[in-house]
C-alpha cells in the first residue's frame, strides 16, 4: 500500500465536504458553511493519495477557537477557557481515512507530516470528538487529555 501525502489548499474544500457528508452523515449545507467559516488551516491540512490517484485520507486542521466549537464552556468554566486561549493552538477539524486503510500506518504518517510545524508554532492541538465516534482511544494513545465535555463532544488537548 503505497501513498503520497500532499498539503491541501482551498481548492480541496469540496473534497472535504464530500468526505465529511459521506463519513459522518452531516448535512451538506451545514458542512459547506463550516468549511467557509471555521478558519481552515489549509497549509497544515493533509490529504493522502494512493498510487492510482485516489484520495484515501484527509486530515483537516482549523484555527477556529474553542468557544466557536462549544459556547457552553464560556458559561461552565470561563477560567479554563481563558487559560487555554492564552496559548497558541490549532484544531483537528476532521481526520478521515478510507476504511481499507484503517489500522495501517497512514494515520500516523499523516500526523507526522505536520508534526514539525505543530511543535514549532503551537502549544497544543485542540481535538473535539463526537461522543458517537470511535476515535477517543486513538487520540488518548497520542497522549491527548480530556479537558471538557458537553452534550455533543469530548474535547481533548494534545500538548506539543
Regions flagged by a language model, labelled:
Residues 2-16:
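A short beta-loop-alpha structural element at the N-terminal edge
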Residues 25-55, 60, 65-66:
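Active-site rim helix/loop that mediates acceptor-substrate recognition in acyltransferases
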Residues 43-47, 58, 89, 94, ...:
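Short hydrophobic/aromatic beta-strand element in the GNAT-like acyltransferase core
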Residues 60-94:
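Conserved acyl-donor/pantetheine-binding loop and adjacent beta-alpha core of acyl/acetyltransferases
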Residues 89-90, 118-131:
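Conserved GNAT acetyl-CoA-binding A-motif
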Residues 94-97, 103-116:
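Conserved acetyl-CoA-binding loop-helix of GNAT-fold acetyltransferases
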Residues 99-102, 126-137:
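Conserved beta-strand-loop-alpha-helix junction that forms the acyl-donor binding cleft
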Residues 131-132, 142-160:
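C-terminal "cap" of GNAT-fold acetyltransferases
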Amino acid at each position: 500500500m503505497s501513498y503520497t501525502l500532499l498539503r491541501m489548499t482551498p481548492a480541496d474544500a469540496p473534497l472535504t465536504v464530500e468526505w465529511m457528508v459521506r463519513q459522518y452523515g452531516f448535512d451538506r449545507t451545514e458542512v459547506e458553511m463550516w468549511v467557509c467559516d471555521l478558519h481552515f488551516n489549509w497549509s497544515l491540512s493533509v490529504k493522502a493519495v494512493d498510487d492510482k490517484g485516489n484520495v484515501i485520507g484527509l486530515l483537516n486542521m482549523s484555527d477556529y477557537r474553542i468557544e466557536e466549537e462549544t459556547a457552553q464552556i464560556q458559561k461552565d468554566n470561563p477560567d479554563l477557557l481563558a487559560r487555554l486561549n492564552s496559548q497558541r493552538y490549532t484544531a483537528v477539524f476532521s481526520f478521515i481515512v478510507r476504511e481499507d486503510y484503517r489500522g495501517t500506518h497512514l494515520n500516523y504518517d499523516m500526523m507526522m507530516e505536520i508534526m514539525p510545524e505543530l511543535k514549532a508554532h503551537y502549544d497544543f492541538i485542540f481535538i473535539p470528538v463526537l461522543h458517537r465516534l470511535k476515535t477517543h482511544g486513538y487520540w488518548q494513545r497520542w497522549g491527548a487529555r480530556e479537558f471538557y465535555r458537553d452534550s455533543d463532544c469530548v474535547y481533548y488537548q494534545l500538548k506539543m
